[in-house]
From Swiss-Prot:
Segments for region (Disordered): 115-149
UniProt record, GO biological process: random inactivation of X chromosome; regulation of transcription by RNA polymerase II
GO cellular component assignments: nucleoplasm; nucleus; PcG protein complex; PRC1 complex; X chromosome
Domain of life: Eukaryota
Name of the protein in its database record: Polycomb group RING finger protein 3
Subunit structure: Component of a PRC1-like complex that contains PCGF3, RNF2 and RYBP. Interacts with CBX6, CBX7 and CBX8. Interacts with BCORL1.
Length: 242
């Protein structure tokens, strides 16, 4: 079968962040226009702006952070195309935890990286559109994972209700994976309170509404840094934003 070779720099524009000009890390997409950036770059930009950095469309007049979402598919593509990128990012994270004297989470202790499998084909800035390693990976039977994210970095949370229209949780203290999202918490609260829909809830940190795709790790780093555990979050009935 014929294969087509593509120069890596020919697709750089599609896998780099317009704000930092580097390869996408923790890829995050604007839901209005589907332009993608590094999460940290986009969040920092939206602290003082409410438009997309690329097309300048207004994301939301007052709460643009609620209209961005983690793009796992794009991040997987970037890691597969750019040799060594995921290993380098994991190494930086480990160094960060070591510097602070904190235990390295289980999900970043190893350096398993699918991009490493493609290293030889990328040495000259080229990638094969039809890579046999993808076929081999697809043929492998996935191993059953019964860990339920227990080996992930864990976050302790206190869920408080700040509305008289909702009742408080019997057990407001929970501990879960740092990779869990605000959406997971909404579903958890809705189930415990027997609400008809989790979309009826807002979750806040420091009186700021959190986007449904924010991971707890992201919330801790950007909203609770240098504060003692547990992470304090409040929930209330959803309020329509003008």
């Amino acid at each position: 079968m014929l294969t087509r070779k593509i120069k890596l720099w020919d697709i750089n524009a599609h896998i780099t962040c317009r704000l930092c000009s580097g390869y996408l890390i923790d890829a995050t997409t604007v839901t209005e226009c589907l332009h993608t950036f590094c999460r940290s770059c986009l969040v920092k930009y939206l602290e003082e702006n409410n438009t997309c950095p690329t097309c300048r469309i207004v994301i939301h007049q007052s709460h643009p952070l609620q209209y961005i979402g983690h793009d796992r598919t794009m991040q997987d593509i970037v890691y597969k195309l750019v040799p060594g990128l995921q290993e380098a990012e994991m190494r930086k994270q480990r160094e960060f935890y070591h510097k602070l004297g904190m235990e390295v989470p289980g999900d970043i202790k190893g350096e398993t990286c699918s991009a490493k499998q493609h290293l030889d084909s990328h040495r000259n800035g080229e990638t094969k559109a039809d890579d046999s390693s993808n076929k081999e990976a697809a043929e492998e039977k996935p191993e059953e994972d019964n860990d339920y994210h227990r080996s992930d970095e864990q976050v302790s949370i206190c869920l408080e209700c700040n509305s008289s229209k909702l009742r408080g949780l019997k057990r407001k203290w929970i501990r879960c994976s740092a990779q869990a999202t605000v959406l997971h918490l909404k579903k958890f609260i809705a189930k415990k309170l027997n609400l008809s829909s989790f979309n009826e809830l807002d979750i806040l940190c420091n009186e700021e509404i959190l986007g449904k795709d924010h991971t707890l790790k992201f919330v801790v780093v950007t909203r609770w840094r240098f504060k003692k555990a547990p992470l304090l979050l409040h929930y209330r009935p959803k309020m329509d934003l003008l």
